[in-house]
Amino acid sequence: MPRLLTLLALAPAAALLKPTRRAPVPKLRVPAEAGGAVASKSSVTSSTLNLAKNIVGAGVLSLPAGIAACSASKKAAVPACGLIAGLGLVSAYCFALVGRACAATGTTTYRGAWESAVDKDSGALITGITTFKTLVGCIAYCIIIGDTAGSLLSGAAVPELLKRRDVFLSLFGAAVLFPLSMLRDLKSLAPASIIGLGGMLYTAGVTVLRALDGTYQKGGRLAAALVKEGKALPKFGGAFSPGGSLLFISMLATSYLAHYNAAAYYDELENPTLPRYNRVVYGGFAMAVGFFVSIAAAGHRTFGAASQGLILNSFAGADKLANAARALVGVAVACTYPLLFKGVREGYFDIAKVSPANQEKQRTPATIAMVALTVLAGIKITDLGFVVAFGGAILGSAIIYVIPSQIALSACKKGKLALGGAEKLACRSINVMGYVLAVLGGTASVLSRMGKI
């Protein structure tokens, strides 16, 4: 169960999104950059694909374990996938709400929408929430790098010292993560997006293939390899676990986490009208839901109760296809780390109110300290446990459900955003649901910490 907690930080109808007759379809005002140039724009297709890639992160690899926490029965995948799709729809609606609020208030950031609609003086709180959540993501990435490297190096002809998690992660942090995090222009990491998408698609393909080819079933070639390697064999059956369901719901409360980028997707959309933006949002989330369902169902069907928090750890070391997936995911995570890290560093400067001049002076020491912190956490806390489950579930629910719905309700109250009666009810319900999911996630993490789940 602690393995499942590690990746918790990493898991209304569309008609309601149509502008009401009381409000015309707005276009977002796009500020000109220095020199009068206007920022480049993205097409609907490009934005949709980018959003799908933004949503589908390494956290999807924990979903099979999430279903297993509920039940090891093969039938459990059906209602679990329905829940994945349902919360995906609600998450998409909340994502779209942020874009609508930005269009209505003339703001271009998640924090800006909050300050304009809710409270100008509490913007730092929004920055703090998103910064901490991003920091947890960086730590989770270090854990994934440590796990994938450990699996790949275990049988490799390398010095035994390098196979130690603490040694490898320390060297990797100093030689790879720190230099990448110091880059001023992250455009050079653009290929990482392609590698990441390709790696996740490949991993999904391998997971589905192994669910169908029977090699991990009793008597199968790779089942024998699991026994030889001392790994858990696939196990099915067992009763439904209410406590495990709390953890799965907490995971789903954060699986679709991308909402702090909602304003940017609207801002960068070519001809940014609400109908075009909604096509991006629902298209991107639909792709993500399909991806989540395929990996969750296939991984659970293959391993059942033996599904680990990082499903790749459940595969045999002798599985060459799975090893390739481990390598691709490891590379993608390493290249994505600096993108997350930039948000952590900038969030720290914002919260600490560091002046631009001092930011330049503190950039190197701050980067060293923060990279060291995430690497040390990845070494010492192989399972983020209570910190990720408690803080992640609460902050994730806030970012996805509570904050967007509160922005919409407050903007409506101030006359900046038109909401019909059905939408007001939907937003209030989602707002309450966000608090409930936060409480459930926090409760589940505490109970797990106490050994009650």
PLM regions: where:
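Membrane-interface "cap" regions at the ends of multi-pass membrane proteins
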Residues: 21-76, 91-93
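The first (N-terminal) embedded transmembrane alpha-helix
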Residues: 44-62, 174, 253-258, 295, ...
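Alpha-helical transmembrane segments of multi-pass membrane proteins, especially transporters
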Residues: 50, 80-84, 88, 130, ...
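Extracellular loop-to-transmembrane helix junctions
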Residues: 66-107
